[in-house]
Amino acid sequence: RSRGLGDVYKRQVEGINRLAFTDADWAGRQYIIDRMTDAGLSIEIDDFGNVIGYKSGKKPELPVVMVGSHTDSVPNGGNYDGVVGVLSAIEVIRSMIDDGYEHDHTIAVVDFMCEESGRFGNATLGSKAMRGELTVQDLHRLVDKQGISLYEALKGRNLNPDGIEIMKYKRPVKSFTEIHIEQGKVLEHERKTIGIVTGIAAPERFYVTIRGNADHSGATPMNLRHDALCGASKIILGIEEIASMQEEPPVVGTVGVVEVTPGAMNVIPGAVKLGVDIRSISKAARDSVVTLVKEFIDITAEKRGLSYTIETIAQDQPVEMHPAMIREIEEAVKSVGVEYMTMPSGAGHDAMHWAEVVPTGMIFIPCRDGISHNPAEFAEMDDIVTGADVLDKVLRKLSLEETKLV
């Protein structure tokens, strides 16, 4: 079924391009709605566009057992990131219905909108919306490269951005589970089929705009230049060095956006905008690196006669998975009979926003060579099926009233 979803992706030679709220994203979302309907789920769409499919339990008054992931992509992305989680959950529900499996708690399968930060620079927006963590001001503030705000994107899809501050998911939730490709090389290297996630790292993201003088490249001597790009280059290397110095717990730092103005060969760069992502499983370690990076930016700018501004766009919190959920997943893996390991997640996921309020667990499957956010992203079908089998056992048990998460 992931191949079927791939057919509606805006797929080009360079990969999957299904950025949030684009036509390609909306076509993929409709595919998920169709698959949920085919599986016998009742569909609910919230004001942010999140798709929620329900399989009713015998006791609908009980808190729902939630499972989900996302189906939007980064620019030029792969065919498995997020998709494995949503389609696996739907197939588990289909299996339950085929088996006539009866359970107490209603199960909610969610396709979260705008999990990727590729369009608006801020990740997991759909789950943030469901958790009541967004404001109308946020929707106006987040703008894509074409100058379209998230508010406008929602309006363009006939959604209700003005209701964002009162759209927090109202039903009580017993648990949240997400299955995902690892997006790293650890499982493959350790020859393990399943990873049981113990915690999720989270990023602090900010834009740094460095300003110098856009002078003539031929008429300005080297000793009289204020080259914003040279300063930015020094800052990029400084971020790499500072993050590398923090060994335990580790911190990673990435500059994934570089915009140079005016961008002409005969003009010294007058301004450079950098998009910086610094993340760790430890908030204290991450905050320490962010502080050092900002101090380094200040020193570099002063030495080179440059000015700068910093705009923080995200400060997500690292979270731990619930011990009871880790135990439930471990029990399911053992019953399936495959090799597994416990591990942290370096990448952020929708699960991190539910972990703050309900027992949450994550299941990883390997991806080839650890490649993700890339057209070469690939997961073996046997691993996907094994992961779905584990998820099936977890959800069947969680959906029983007698299963207590303590």
Tell where the protein language model's regions lie, with residue ranges.
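Single conserved hydrophobic/aromatic residue that forms the stacking wall/gate
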Residues: 1-9
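Zn-dependent metallopeptidase/amidohydrolase metal-coordination segment
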Residues: 7, 68-69, 340-390
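A non-catalytic alpha/beta surface segment that caps or lines the substrate-entry region
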Residues: 14-56
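A short beta-alpha structural unit
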Residues: 19-21, 254-263, 275-282, 307-326, ...
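Catalytic-core environment of secreted peptidases
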Residues: 39, 51-84, 216
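Alpha-helical metal-binding/catalytic segments enriched in His/Glu/Asp
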Residues: 67, 76-116, 204-210, 216, ...
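Midchain, well-structured core segments that form catalytic/ion-binding scaffolds
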Residues: 114-115, 121-283
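His/Asp/Glu-rich mid-to-C-terminal helical/loop segments that flank catalytic regions of hydrolases
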Residues: 198-200, 216, 220-245, 285, ...
